[in-house]
Amino acid sequence: MQFRPYIVAPVTLLVMSMGVFCGAEAKTIEAGHATVSWKGKGVIDDLGDGDKVFSGTLTGTILVKHLSEGSEPAQIHQTKMDCQAILYISKKVEQPKTILCILRAHQGKDLAYVEVRCAGKTGECKGEMTWVWGKGGFKGITGTTPFVAGIYIEEQKKGEVYGSAHWPELTYTLP
């Protein structure tokens, strides 16, 4: 049959695009609301005019309230957060900030590396958190989710900052 070679290639491509040969399709996880109170230790440089730069580490425990399904009660899970940050903190000018973090869940069995980018003045920073890579249960993790944070400098203790962060709808994708 002469027309057979022309039909085999398109059918093969169609089947492969449906995931039969490539494995299951990626699954988006809607984890729910997440929040963290964090503490930072490092160096704070006073730039004058109320502007400061913080360079150091941020640590905290993220609490994620997983949405309930049916009559099941909501569950709260925790994830340890360790970050490196250089933050320009200004009362007058909205400044971009970048924070790099390792998240450890399930007694350290599951690791995720995230990059947080936000912009704002002292007290508030709005932006996104991007899942870069993961190991264990987070292997192959991707996605971007909205992020809001507050940053406060402890005037009494040298080199310490405090803050909180919130993810109203924490989501990510796993293969």
Kindly label every feature range from the protein language model.
Residues M1, G19-V20, K52, G136:
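Short non-domain terminal segments
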Residues R4, G19-F21, I29:
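Absolute N-terminal positional cue centered near the fourth residue
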Residues Y6, F21-G23, S71:
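Short, intrinsically disordered, low-complexity terminal segments
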Residues A9-G19:
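Bacterial N-terminal signal peptides
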Residues M1-V11:
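Bacterial N-terminal signal peptides that target proteins for export
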Residues M1, M16-M18, M81, M129:
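Detector for methionine-enriched segments
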Residues E25-P175:
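Beta-strand-enriched cores of mature, soluble protein domains
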